[in-house]
Amino acid sequence: MTTTQEKTRCTISGRVQGVCFRAATQEQAVRLGVTGYARNLRDGRVEVLACGPPEAVAQLREWLHEGPPAATVESVACEPADDPAPAEFSVG
């Protein structure tokens, strides 16, 4: 039996750098069993790659709209990703 994996890349804009957004995203991802990464982009956004069971990836995507308490999320744009699924969730 093969488990279906979803891979999604999201870019989050707003006040999302310098507010522990990446670390909080990693905590949520690990809790949900999602692998991938969260990294700052030069333009002030954060990019998240989420790989895992579709329901877990959907929960993480939903959480990205709120983020940690210090963040102010203005928009979240997600699209399917073709990246290989990482073994863990990292912050870069």
Swiss-Prot record:
Q: According to the UniProt entry, what is the EC number of this protein?
A: 3.6.1.7
> Which keywords, in A-to-Z order, does the entry hold?
Hydrolase
Protein source organism = Halorhodospira halophila (strain DSM 244 / SL1) (Ectothiorhodospira halophila (strain DSM 244 / SL1))
Q: State the top-level EC class.
A: hydrolase
> This protein's superkingdom?
Bacteria
**In the record, what lineage is assigned to the organism producing the protein?**
Bacteria, Pseudomonadati, Pseudomonadota, Gammaproteobacteria, Chromatiales
Q: Does the keyword Nucleus apply?
A: no
Catalyses which reaction?
Answer: an acyl phosphate + H2O = a carboxylate + phosphate + H(+)
Q: What is this protein called?
A: Acylphosphatase
Q: Mind telling me which Pfam families this protein's record contains?
A: Acylphosphatase (PF00708)
Q: Where is the signal peptide?
A: none
Could you cite one Gene Ontology molecular function of this protein?
acylphosphatase activity
The record's annotation in SUPFAM superfamilies points to: Acylphosphatase/BLUF domain-like (SSF54975)
- Coiled coil located at which positions? none
Q: Which residues form the Acylphosphatase-like domain?
A: 7-92
Q: Which gene encodes it?
A: acyP
Active-site feature positions: 22, 40
Say which family it is in. Belongs to the acylphosphatase family.
